[in-house]
Amino acid sequence: MNFLAHLHLAHLAESSLSGNLLADFVRGNPEESFPPDVVAGIHMHRRIDVLTDNLPEVREAREWFRSETRRVAPITLDVMWDHFLSRHWSQLSPDFPLQEFVCYAREQVMTILPDSPPRFINLNNYLWSEQWLVRYRDMDFIQNVLNGMASRRPRLDALRDSWYDLDAHYDALETRFWQFYPRMMAQASRKAL
């Protein structure tokens, strides 16, 4: 899962949206640095990552990547799941339009920015103003996201080419998303993530 899915599942679970978004920017034990609700959100994010990576649908999808891009498949798929969530938001969350949800999520996250790591602050400078969560529905934007990640981290250069794997298996990936994401939504609503 990437930013949008983590925020969405956190909302359904009544967990800290801030903690769920912040988690990738925090190493080790967060308990000394953040309030309990944010810590709980960080831990939820980490559980979701482990759960998602071990889902049979996701393990199967990783195998569709070519040998030269398979190493970055987990990252590429996380971004792709956000694409499908953004694209199908009105079906999955009909009572909370995506643009309204993005505004709500931004308000929640802004409360912790003053005490956040610089890289997280930098992310927030772009995430909201450039409407990333809404733009995830556009595959051209997904390609830009993957290229941007590859540019910032040269060891992940294979992300550029992983775009072709997404394109080649788009329909099958969308089917897998529909197989597992509604289950995760139900788990979040039951606070079972």
Swiss-Prot record:
Spans traversing the lipid bilayer: none
A Pfam family of this chain: ACP_PD
InterPro entries reported in the protein's UniProt record: ACP_PD, ACP_phosphodiesterase_gpbac
Catalysed reactions, semicolon-separated: holo-[ACP] + H2O = apo-[ACP] + (R)-4'-phosphopantetheine + H(+)
Superkingdom per UniProt: Bacteria
Keywords: Fatty acid biosynthesis, Fatty acid metabolism, Hydrolase, Lipid biosynthesis, Lipid metabolism
Single GO BP term: fatty acid biosynthetic process
EC number: 3.1.4.14
Top EC class of this enzyme: hydrolase
Molecular-function GO terms, alphabetical: [acyl-carrier-protein] phosphodiesterase activity
HAMAP family: AcpH
Family of this protein: Belongs to the AcpH family.
Primary role: Converts holo-ACP to apo-ACP by hydrolytic cleavage of the phosphopantetheine prosthetic group from ACP.
Protein name: Acyl carrier protein phosphodiesterase
Phylogenetic placement of the source organism: Bacteria, Pseudomonadati, Pseudomonadota, Gammaproteobacteria, Enterobacterales
